[in-house]
Amino acid sequence: MSRAVGIDLGTTNSVVAVLEGGEPVVIANAEGNRTTPSVVAFSKDGETLVGDVAKRQAVTNVDRTVASVKRHMGTDWTTEIDGKKYTPQEISARTLMKLKADAESYLGDTVTDAVITVPAYFNDAERQATKEAGEIAGMNVLRIVNEPTAAALAYGLEKGKEDELILVFDLGGGTFDVSLLEVGKDEDDFSTIQVRATAGDNRLGGDDWDQRIVDWLLEQVKSKTGADLSKDKIALQRLKEAAEQAKKELSSATSTTISLQYLSVTPEGPVHLDEKLSRAKFEDLTKDLLARTEKPFKDVISEAGINVSDIDHVVLVGGSTRMPAVVEKVTELAGKAPNKGVNPDEVVAIGAAIQAGVLKGDRKDVLLIDVTPLSLGIETKGGVMTKLIERNTAIPTKRSETFTTAEDNQPSVSIQVFQGEREFTRDNKNLGTFELTGIAPAPRGMPQIEVTFDIDANGIVHVSAKDKGTGKEQSMTITGGTSLSKEDIDRMVKDAEANADADKQRREAADRRNNAEQTAYSVEKLIKDDEGAIPEDVKSEVQADVDAVKAALEGDDDDAVKTAFEKLQSSQTKIGEALYAQSQAEGAAGAGAGAAGAEGAQAKEDDDIVDAEVVDDDNDGKK
């Protein structure tokens, strides 16, 4: 019987875990380690090296070794080795194949299914790429799960029965996420884990801390020897490895010595490095990186609508959270010390293994509810972003809304799908466009076009549009090439905050234009339909106001539209007054003709009158 595993596919290291007897177990690799470096190398004789062996030979095989490829997932990045171009999916697949083989060796069985984790702020392109990597590795990807959610799943199941809020602070090798989750258990020990809010930075991680040490060491070498090693690939690889080791040592020691003999050779002779780096200096070099963790933290608290004091537990995920400065920052932000009972390197894979067990039916005591990080919508008249699914909505989810045509006898509509937080589509990210054709000829406003957004449990978006009248339907799936980059997400959120007022004013102006156009259309139609019943002077006045609105709409002056629209709103009431007056006059004439007959019947009717009171009882449910 094939087995399902949970995999934490990390930037720096990866971990695989499996359920054994209903409990998660981390699987050690062939080298005996519980974490596997996410490093892939191609030897000159054609052998593919993965993990520890690839990392060990990196210095002597720099051009044929690839690390931290997770940062390129969902992009068009490639690396060429021996004339063959490799995509991030292909490189990641090599790491996944290694984890799969190690798991099969441990289990003595084949592994066909996997739950793979990704940063919570991964966009559609990055999620698709991760899923493709799993498929390239020969696995059926049961689910793409957010890393902080998996961590909370592993941690939260050990909690008591009361509902608790868990904040997961996930600083990995290349990405950063903060998520707030609500964990609860019922009397039958069934756990529900629901994500309340998530935020992050896909370009912030331990690699950036390492790079600061590398940059500092390059400066030290240049100032003392005059040698510029910034273009020396072998020297840079040695410095990177030394920097990573120094970072780890400074998590437990207040200082460390970095000593690299024969780092390079110049015309003046060999270049040696022997530098002492204190924790204080290291923290000073990286203080701006640490400061970047504050905003996502505060965004999550704000999005969830809670106070910091409401947080019950803080869980640290990712090896980079071992740095003392990070622990201090989290304690400062959360107002409480993080939990010490979680292994930050393994907790995500454990959660993924639990979710794999849930999906395979091996565990039935937990429900996981995740969210989508950005709002999704379509463009409507005036370039307005009409949101169908708001950010931080629980997934999987499906939302539908009915729209109509903007012109008479419109044969088709163009459905443009956007992602972002701004009021106008021009400020958001266009995910794709498709046409719904074959709409039956009809006056504008009559066709009913139902647009449906469907986000699956992997966070991947599907959109469809259906003409309710003809039954014609068209759909699309948002695929990797059209998804957002992290920079786009950050820009959208920042722009939305900075331009909220301007967006509101533009939205009001667009709505006013739409209302003015609709009113002018309706009033003009009313004049034509009841032409004989409307006095000529009223008809002329109102038609002039309709023409003024149409003229204003052709220009770009929103104030002119507002003025013309207000005048039309005022004058159109005269049509109603005229029609009502005519109706009353016709009624009065009819009443006069029947008055004589009414008098004869009055005496008899008076005898039948019951002296009673009509009571309108709001509490009476009878109609």
From Swiss-Prot:
Q: Where is the composition biased (Basic and acidic residues)?
A: 497-515
Give induction info: By stress conditions e.g. heat shock.
Q: Which UniProt keywords apply?
A: ATP-binding, Chaperone, Nucleotide-binding, Phosphoprotein, Stress response
Q: Where is this region: Disordered?
A: 497-521, 585-623
Q: Which GO terms describe its molecular function?
A: ATP binding; ATP-dependent protein folding chaperone; unfolded protein binding
Biased composition, class Acidic residues, residue ranges: 605-623
Chain positions found as Phosphothreonine: T175
A Pfam family cross-referenced in the UniProt record is HSP70
Indicate the family of this protein.
Belongs to the heat shock protein 70 family.
List the PANTHER family. Answer: HEAT SHOCK PROTEIN 70KDA
Q: What does this protein do?
A: Acts as a chaperone.
Protein's name according to its UniProt entry: Chaperone protein DnaK
Q: Which gene encodes it?
A: dnaK
